[in-house]
């Protein structure tokens, strides 16, 4: 049996994507819509306080295309806290005019390829990646993925050393985009339908296409990668929520 890679796990993660029922939303009076928006912004302010205390992080983006209208990416120390956030949001007036489009549950994950004599949880750089402050980049790209396990293309039957070698080569491509694209990898084996979630942040949306396309030619992706639905969007700052929901 091949050796399983050890992982380092950080904050739990929820990608919550929703569509807005604009037709029903328009039936509310201006006052009712304003009250609903204020209620929603109060929840966002709670999230901001948690982030300021470094007990979690969040990102909010509008999604381009028909798959969804808005995405919340939420990071918290426990799965219970993610559930509480989701439930509180579902109880708002605004949620009555939102339709669940997609969700993904995972945990921030790093593969442990550090020297055996080093405690990764004492490494500030590792801690910053396990418990990240999500960036306020202009754009987001999220997609789930698996490692293929079919016939001769079975990732999980490869020896550990070969997997390390392949992942090192794969990572070299990603490092070429340092400063252009920030990546958050979350593990979801046993949590959701795929094995990993990949979230990319960039100020230049074209960098997503360049990075993903270049990685398609790397053996890890070309031979072993299987991908789910891609979601791409634009940042939605709190101060623009009112204009976004204005009808």
Swiss-Prot record:
Xref: NCBIfam families: PRK12276.1
Chain positions recorded as Fe-coproporphyrin III binding sites: 129, 143-147, 170, 183, 221
Record field: catalytic activity: Fe-coproporphyrin III + 2 H2O2 + 2 H(+) = heme b + 2 CO2 + 4 H2O; Fe-coproporphyrin III + H2O2 + H(+) = harderoheme III + CO2 + 2 H2O; harderoheme III + H2O2 + H(+) = heme b + CO2 + 2 H2O
Cofactor(s) for this UniProt protein: Fe-coproporphyrin III
Gene3D superfamilies, alphabetized: Apc35880, domain 1
Keyword set, alphabetical order: Heme, Heme biosynthesis, Iron, Metal-binding, Oxidoreductase
One Pfam family here: Chlor_dismutase
Similarity comment: Belongs to the ChdC family. Type 1 subfamily.
Entries under InterPro entries matching the protein: CHDC, ChdC/CLD, Dimeric_a/b-barrel
Catalytic residues, chain numbering: 143
Pathway note: Porphyrin-containing compound metabolism; protoheme biosynthesis
GO molecular-function terms, A-Z: heme binding; metal ion binding; oxidoreductase activity, acting on the CH-CH group of donors, oxygen as acceptor; peroxidase activity
EC class: oxidoreductase
Gene: chdC
Protein name per Swiss-Prot or TrEMBL: Coproheme decarboxylase
UniProt function note: Involved in coproporphyrin-dependent heme b biosynthesis. Catalyzes the decarboxylation of Fe-coproporphyrin III (coproheme) to heme b (protoheme IX), the last step of the pathway. The reaction occurs in a stepwise manner with a three-propionate intermediate.
